[in-house]
A protein has these predicted regions:
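A conserved acidic beta->alpha catalytic loop
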Residues: 27, 36-47
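Short beta-strand/loop segment that forms part of the nucleotide-sugar
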Residues: 32-41, 59-61
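Glycine-rich, basic loop-to-helix element that forms the pyrophosphate-binding segment
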Residues: 60-78
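Short aromatic/hydrophobic "clamp" motif used to bind/position activated sugar donors
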Residues: 83
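Short, flexible, basic/aromatic active-site loop/helix in glycosyltransferases
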Residues: 122-147
Length: 200
């Protein structure tokens, strides 16, 4: 099944990330649904976002519960088959989502990931390097957590391990995906600008 604007929700976990999140939200097509999980009790911040942006739902966790809990809360609130986990310190290129939509129709996947426009595959072990320069996607064992698209139907309820506060929660998720025999891909030509670790 192909990812589209109608069956995708973008989930962003923040903690008072006002300085960076607006650049992120401004880079997202306003027609795409967005869920913001603010890991604090600052309702003024989330209200500003709701007042300014379309198709956005904001929730306050009350305190910093970590990335795993925040992402799981966003996934639980989402109503679409696909979710895109996105850090607030990322900026999508103009064609990032379109390239994800196009490539997704030819792949059976649990997780897809665009890459940073500064990346040249330094953190990925490509499983089959044959003709990799000509391919638009590669199967890998894991992807970085700042941007990943998840097919919720490939999971048995459990997504991120809530006992992992941050940094390794995406590695654990990818490991469990591979143990189930599901596939993870990176998309070479779907790129984003990752500014740095400014989420929680």
């Amino acid at each position: 099944m192909q990812i589209t604007k109608d069956n995708l929700t973008i989930i962003i976990v923040t903690i008072k990330s006002e300085k960076v999140i607006e650049k992120c939200l401004n880079s997202i097509d306003p027609k795409v649904k967005k869920i913001i999980i603010e890991n604090s009790s600052d309702e003024n911040f989330t209200q500003k976002l709701k007042d300014k942006y379309q198709n956005i739902d904001c929730y306050n966790s009350g305190k910093n519960l970590g990335m795993g809990v925040g992402n799981n809360l966003g996934i639980k609130k989402s109503k679409t088959r696909y979710v895109m986990i996105l850090n607030p310190d990322t900026i999508l290129n103009n064609d990032t989502l379109d390239k994800i939509f196009k490539i997704s129709k030819s792949l059976d996947f649990a997780i897809l990931s665009p890459i940073s426009d500064k990346d040249n595959f330094p953190n990925y072990k490509i499983k089959n390097k044959t003709n990799y320069l000509e391919k638009d996607f590669f199967e890998v064992d894991q992807v970085d957590g700042y941007s990943m698209v998840i097919d919720k139907t490939k999971f048995d309820e459990k997504f991120f391990d809530e006992n992992i506060f941050m940094y390794l929660e995406n590695d654990d998720l990818c490991l469990r995906v591979k143990k189930k025999g599901e596939k993870i891909f990176i998309l070479k030509n779907a790129k984003i600008n990752h500014l740095g670790a400014k989420a929680v």
